[in-house]
Swiss-Prot record:
Organism: Xanthomonas oryzae pv. oryzae (strain MAFF 311018)
Gene3D superfamilies per record: 3.30.300.30, N-terminal domain of ligase-like
Chain positions with N6-acetyllysine modification: K608
GO cellular-component term (any): cytosol
Keywords: Acetylation, ATP-binding, Ligase, Magnesium, Metal-binding, Nucleotide-binding
Enzyme Commission no: 6.2.1.1
Catalytically driven reaction(s): acetate + ATP + CoA = acetyl-CoA + AMP + diphosphate
Binding site for ATP: G386, E387, P388, D410, T411, W412, W413, Q414, T415, D499, R514, R525
InterPro entries the record matches: Ac_CoA_lig, ACAS_N, AMP-bd_C, AMP-bd_C_sf, AMP-binding_CS, AMP-dep_synth/lig_dom, ANL_N_sf
Name of the protein described by the UniProt record: Acetyl-coenzyme A synthetase
Residues binding Mg(2+): V536, H538, V541
Positions contributing to CoA binding: R190, G191, G192, K193, T310, N334, S522, R583
PTMs per UniProt: Acetylated. Deacetylation by the SIR2-homolog deacetylase activates the enzyme.
Role, per record: Catalyzes the conversion of acetate into acetyl-CoA (AcCoA), an essential intermediate at the junction of anabolic and catabolic pathways. AcsA undergoes a two-step reaction. In the first half reaction, AcsA combines acetate with ATP to form acetyl-adenylate (AcAMP) intermediate. In the second half reaction, it can then transfer the acetyl group from AcAMP to the sulfhydryl group of CoA, forming the product AcCoA.
Amino acid sequence: MADVYPVDPAFAADARVTREQYAALYRESIEHPEQFWGKAAQRLEWFKQPTQVKDVSYALDDFHIRWFGDGELNASVNCLDRQLATRGDKTALLFEPDSPDAASYPVTYRQLYERVCKLGNALRNLGVKKGDRVTIYLPMIVDAAVAMLACARIGAVHSVVFGGFAANSIADRVIDCQSKLIITADEGLRGGKKIPLKANVDAALKIPGTNTIETVLVVRHTGGAVEMQAPRDRWFHDVVDGQPAECEPERMNAEDPLFILYTSGSTGKPKGVLHTTAGYLLFASYTHEVVFDLREDDIYWCTADVGWVTGHSYIVYGPLANGATAVMFEGVPNYPNVSRFWEVIDKHQVTIFYTAPTAIRALMRDGAEPVKKTSRKSLRLLGSVGEPINPEAWRWYYDVVGDSRCPIVDTWWQTETGGILISPLAGAVDLKPGSATLPFFGVQPALVDAEGKILEGATEGNLVLLDSWPGQMRSVYGDHQRFIDTYFRTYPGSYFTGDGCRRDADGYYWITGRVDDVINVSGHRIGTAEVESALVSHPKVAEAAVVGFPHDVKGQGIYAYVTLIAGETPSDELHKELVSWVRKEIGPIASPDHLQWAPGLPKTRSGKIMRRILRKIAENAPDQLGDTSTLADPSVVDSLVNERLTR
């Protein structure tokens, strides 16, 4: 089995970036960042050209991150207006519905522009002003992109909430950013099932603290019956359709906020990752063009949901700023059958396909036949995102899906980074299954030990980034101190990613997974603290500890240890009740895969739960527990080992 897949000479001959160009551009981006990013800024259309490029200090006593600080622009103008002259009739978004029996349809750049302008005008009429926050809780439909771009047009800050989150999660996010308006739909569709979006919003808005919401706009999507509460609730199309199809864009400073996106942290509630306008848009569009080797006639399909950062950067902002055609898919990989992805690729002649290892591993289980009965001849490049891809899944993706002729870009990045940081460029970098390979322009990875000492050569350590890049998040919304403490205090002078990583003798990077209390489930980050607090909020639960464990399909699963209050006894009914309790509190993605009853939890004498031990038990590695003598009650461990659910 090949360990290295060299660059295909035919691909390299026509690639946007060759091996030599990558080396030269990377060197320039590190040695002369002002010059490099100053030139790159010409990709964008500005109302006022920036004269400053980079103004960054990671010093804790003078901390700031500013890019293109005196420039003025508008993100929606860059995604829509500037495309109209040459690409007005080109398809911007190709909508593919949940059911293959429903009609798919193209939306051109001109049509998208008009829809965005109409919604922008409607939002202004409803009192939404520059800087106001708007919550978007929609399925994967074109109106989700319209809503994001309409906010950008009028200078409102959008906060998209994934349609799989439950009422409590919506309320948390509304309260945290003091949102003024929600855009939702009657229902979503996923794998033939209806998701009660409007009902979830109604439940969320009964929770104290959500009364900043003045208006709920409801897209009629399935036509399902919903309760409408006047005057708060309005039908989206009643409010929007009659508006003028031109809308004056707001002039935004480069560092004005574009959006907030909530992501799980290792402590407590999700944090609102704040991205600003120019640096984010530049980085999303530049990485999209270069990493995916974009051509004018490509049909590009990223299977992510707009509720995650991948959907923000690589379905909406990156592709549209580049004038590309992107598929927007409402469905799931296995509905109505496990050939659905490949059928959609053939139907729309998709050339670039970007998905998550979880989807690949799930589809691998059904073997090659459901793939091989489709053509997939249109494909020329494959991508992977969301979590490390194991070499077996990589090879299956390469051999079976790509017929051993499409390079794979295995992209590592985070909600916080705005865009891809480590990835091969298919015309420039030889591939190794399981490795994200080399850094993108301007990105300076380093590996450090626990003390923060930089490690050289082939080694393993904690992944940090030594300097800023334009797409970097600027703050945690409403809590700048938390931003500094989370990312810059652990290893002063650098950004701590929270990921472990090894570097091989060729300088390639291999991401090994989170080193903090965050679990990566199917490419979605879940904070263990979130799941624990959901469990503990149940009246019968005294204590809970949650860890990740290796999962064949999801990458990591959720393993919960639960101690009940005195007088309560474990039962199958209570087990089911607790799992559905977590689903209700957070959403289905946070459902525990295993829930083990624990008479007690392993604690130090100071009362700290020893998660390291719980992790090893969940990983079915009881021989690797290490020293348990420092525990307040070492006997607790034996009973947990004996009752473990993963052996």
